[in-house]
Amino acid sequence: MSGWFKKAKNIFAVMMTAACLLVLPGCQNGEPEEEVPMKTVPVTDEEGNPVTDDKGETVMTEVPLETIAVTDEEGNPVTDENGEQVYEYEELPEEEKTVYKVGFVYSGYVADGATNGAFEVARAQIGRSLGLETCYVENVLVSQFPEAVSTLKDDGCNIIVSCSPKYASSAFRENKNSTDTYFISFGVAETGAHLDSFGGELYQTANVCGLAAAHNTKSNTIGVIADPGEYNVYGVIDGFALGVAELMSAKADIRVNWAWSNSKSEIEEAVDDLIAQGCDVIMSYMETDYPVRYCADKNVKVIANCYNMPEIAPDNYISGYFFNFSTHLVDVIRSIVNDNFNPDGYSGDVASGMVRLVNFNENSEKGTGDICKTLYDYIKAGNAKVFTGEIKDTDGQVMVEKGQSMTFENIQKINWLVQSVRKTGSFTEITDNPVGSDFSIHSEFADSTTAPAEN
């Protein structure tokens, strides 16, 4: 007799015995049968070991609840009017409901805005939509990530949102060591049983902003200041540059300066250098909105990865491109709460609403909104792919053949700049003893944590 047949036979015997004990007396008296309550238990083999399926999951089955003889306070049997022992069903322990708390790990300061500002918008939405408590630690170095996770876990967090691609590898390692914690990691990388990674096609809206920059420049020289550690930084810069070339073609002249987001002095030097080169429009891709404010102080037109451009540079902004993290993070965290978490390494685009565009400033050149909306709509409908050849790099080498389009996976791996980038400069400096996080836990929100409606 096979093991499975024996198990099935044993389970059936238990069910029949319980049924006889509980309902047959009622049947003899002509009364309706009593419904036997059931409980879910693991199936075991003859030695008492749990039986698993092909996926390694324990096989479960339903069996009747056990009956227990009722006794009084002194332990004496309780009998009915006929002198028969009274029985009752066993009580099952109430299933404990997990209380979730979400902790965010920032590589910069929340007050810096830009990417961190977009995550703060999402953090606020998580509270509004799911009613969950959230908190964060900020200015966390890559080497401090494990300690930041431990700090948040000690504070009750069992969902950790890693807010920088710099942490991708660290989040993956922590996920393997923390089976009681879920990780949601910004920066498309590996997934795991308790790890989801996500990103987006920010180069799409950067491409539209490139067209806007070309329409608004008078000097025909456009600057870019970027942090080398930003998500898909070459893809975003190249997407912007290709947008410039849509209007300016061979005349496109773009200058790129690198600076770290946590150094105001580097940012100022990089922006000043771009202005000295004749750039009258500057695009910023950093983890801080300081370049936007500095450009406004210098009375230079500016575009950046900030959702709140009208607030921080009302007279100087042209537009902005930014991540809308709210919908995805709320959906993923809801799936964790509802116990149907399914990590898939999500990447959102314009069509999904993951990447968005700031409404164009009324002070922009006439026609900016119209010409850019046409390109935006084409991209949103899937009719215009940003990285379609022929595309050459700064050395004149063909990187994308004519008529061919790069896949999202290949765009993520770009480590070159397009031919319209005429000059680059680096203002980054190595710091021997960088100042990291003090691991203070915060939960307060800034005044502005609502992203603008889609234009």
Language model: regions and residue ranges:
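Hydrophobic alpha-helical targeting segments used for export or membrane insertion
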Residues: 17-21
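A residue-level marker of the well-folded mature domains of exported/periplasmic proteins
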Residues: 33, 56, 72-455
